C-alpha cells in the first residue's frame, strides 16, 4: 500500500514539469502546441499617462475613471473596440487591446465618455477613424451641463504587429498621452453700475468629435453658465466647455438685458492668439481660464457701456480706446 502511494507521488512529481511546460506553451503560443500561429491571441498593451508640452514629467490623472479604446489599421479601419471601467492610471498599469492580424495600428483612446454624450454606431471592419464617435447632448441651442466632469483624448504612435512565424513577439507595448479636452472658464465683468442688467454667454461649435480627436462640423452651441452679481459693479459666470480651439466659433458675449444690445462680443481663442502676449497663454498647456473684462461708459446712442480691457489669467491681452 505504502509502496503504491510512493509510486503515485513520484509520478505526480515527475509529471508536474510536463504540465507546467504544456501550460506555458498554451499561454505563450509555443510552436510545440500550435501547428501555426493563426489562432494565437495577440494584441497591444497600452500604458496611459498625461503630459503637456509645459510639463517636465508625466502624470496619471486620478479623475480618468473610464477608457474607450479603439485600434485602427493602416487604412484607418476599426479593428478593435474596448471599454475599460474603474480605471486607475499608473506608470506600471497597461491595458490589453486584442488584435487578430499582423499589421500597422494606431490606438485612439477617450477618457470619461459618459451619459453626457451620444455615441455613434461602431462596426469592427467598417468604421473609419474619420467618422463621428460622439456628440455632446444638447437641448435646442443649449449644451448639456458638464460642470464637474472632464474629457480626455490620447493617440499612440503607429505600432506594428509582425509575423510570429518570423520570430516576432506575441504582444507589443506602447504608450499614449492623454490630453484634457475640457476647459473651465470664469468670466467677470467689472465697472458696471447695474451688474444685474447684464448676461454673459459662451458658445462654440466644438460639440462633436471624430475617433481621431478632431472636431467634426457642428452648429454653435451655448454652454450653460448662470450670470451672478458678485459685487456692487461686477457680474460673473462660470462655464465648463469642451476643448476651445481656433476655427470653431468660440464666441464670448456680454448683453445688456433691458435693451438686448451686446456690449461685447469676441472669438475668445482668436483674441488670445492675436494678442502680443499670446506666448504667455499656451492653449496646449492651460485648461482653466480666468477672464476679466473691464467696462467703461461710452458716448453711445443708448448711453450704455462697452468693454475696454480684456484680461486673461492675469495678462492684459487687449485694450481699446473709446470716445468718452
Curated annotation (Swiss-Prot):
PTM (free text): Palmitoylated. Palmitoylation is important for export to the outer membrane. Unlike other fimbrial subunits, does not contain a propeptide that is cleaved by gingipain.
Disruption-associated phenotype: Minor fimbriae are longer than normal and are easily detached from the cell by mild shear stress.
Recorded topology in the membrane: Lipid-anchor
Residue positions bearing lipid (N-palmitoyl cysteine): 29
Lineage: Bacteria, Pseudomonadati, Bacteroidota, Bacteroidia, Bacteroidales
Signal peptide feature range: 1-28
Function: Anchoring subunit of the minor fimbriae. Regulates fimbrial length. These filamentous pili are attached to the cell surface; they mediate biofilm formation, adhesion onto host cells and onto other bacteria that are part of the oral microbiome. Fimbriae of P.gingivalis are major virulence factors.
Name used for this protein in its record: Minor fimbrium anchoring subunit Mfa2
Lipid attachment residues per UniProt (S-diacylglycerol cysteine): 29
Further information: The name (minor fimbrium subunit) does not indicate the abundance of the protein, but is derived from the greater length of the major fimbriae. In strain ATCC 33277 and strain ATCC BAA-1703 / FDC 381, major fimbriae are 300 - 1600 nM in length and about 5 nm in diameter. In contrast, minor fimbriae are only about 80 - 120 nm long. This length difference is observed only in a small number of strains, including strain ATCC 33277 and strain ATCC BAA-1703 / FDC 381, and is due to a loss of function mutation in FimB, a protein that restricts fimbrial length in other strains.
InterPro entries, alphabetized: FimB/Mfa2/Mfa3
Principal localisation: membrane
An example Gene Ontology biological process: pilus assembly
Family: Belongs to the bacteroidetes fimbrillin superfamily. FimB/Mfa2 family.
Domain of life: Bacteria
GO CC terms: cell outer membrane
UniProt subunit comment: Mfa2 is not part of the fimbrium itself, but anchors the fimbrium in the outer membrane via its interaction with Mfa1. Linear, head-to-tail oligomerization of fimbrial subunits mediates assembly of the fimbrium stalk, while the minor components Mfa3, Mfa4 and Mfa5 probably form the fimbrium tip. The anchoring subunit Mfa2 limits fimbrium length and is important for solid fimbrium attachment to the outer membrane. In its absence, the minor fimbriae become very long and are easily detached from the membrane.
Keywords: Cell outer membrane, Lipoprotein, Membrane, Palmitate, Signal, Virulence
Annotated compartments: Cell outer membrane
Amino acid at each position: 500500500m505504502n509502496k503504491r502511494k510512493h509510486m503515485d507521488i513520484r509520478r505526480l512529481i515527475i509529471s508536474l514539469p510536463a504540465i507546467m511546460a504544456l501550460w506555458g506553451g498554451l499561454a505563450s503560443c509555443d510552436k510545440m502546441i500550435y501547428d501555426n500561429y493563426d489562432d494565437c491571441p495577440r494584441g497591444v498593451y497600452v500604458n496611459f499617462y498625461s503630459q503637456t508640452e509645459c510639463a517636465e514629467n508625466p502624470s496619471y490623472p486620478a479623475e480618468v475613471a473610464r477608457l474607450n479604446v479603439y485600434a485602427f489599421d493602416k487604412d484607418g479601419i476599426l479593428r478593435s473596440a474596448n471599454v475599460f471601467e474603474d480605471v486607475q492610471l499608473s506608470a506600471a498599469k497597461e491595458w490589453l487591446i486584442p488584435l487578430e492580424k499582423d499589421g500597422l495600428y494606431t490606438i485612439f483612446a477617450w477618457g470619461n465618455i459618459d451619459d453626457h454624450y451620444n455615441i455613434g454606431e461602431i462596426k469592427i471592419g467598417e468604421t473609419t477613424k474619420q467618422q463621428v464617435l460622439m456628440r455632446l447632448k444638447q437641448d435646442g441651442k443649449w449644451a448639456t451641463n458638464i460642470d464637474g466632469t472632464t474629457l480626455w483624448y490620447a493617440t499612440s504612435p503607429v505600432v506594428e504587429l509582425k509575423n510570429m512565424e518570423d520570430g516576432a513577439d506575441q504582444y507589443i507595448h506602447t504608450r499614449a498621452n492623454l490630453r484634457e479636452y475640457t476647459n473651465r472658464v470664469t468670466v467677470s465683468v467689472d465697472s458696471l453700475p447695474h451688474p444685474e442688467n447684464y448676461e454673459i454667454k459662451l458658445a462654440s461649435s466644438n460639440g462633436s468629435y471624430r475617433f481621431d480627436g478632431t472636431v467634426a462640423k457642428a452648429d454653435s452651441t451655448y454652454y450653460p453658465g448662470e450670470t451672478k452679481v458678485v459685487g456692487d459693479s461686477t457680474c460673473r459666470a462660470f462655464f465648463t466647455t469642451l476643448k476651445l480651439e481656433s476655427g470653431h466659433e468660440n464666441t464670448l458675449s456680454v448683453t445688456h438685458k433691458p435693451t438686448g444690445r451686446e456690449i461685447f462680443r469676441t472669438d475668445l481663442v482668436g483674441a488670445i492668439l492675436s494678442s502680443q502676449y499670446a506666448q504667455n497663454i499656451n492653449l496646449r498647456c492651460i485648461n482653466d481660464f480666468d477672464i476679466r473684462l473691464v467696462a467703461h461708459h461710452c458716448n453711445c446712442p443708448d448711453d450704455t457701456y462697452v468693454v475696454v480691457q480684456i484680461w486673461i489669467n492675469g495678462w492684459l491681452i487687449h485694450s481699446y480706446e473709446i470716445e468718452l
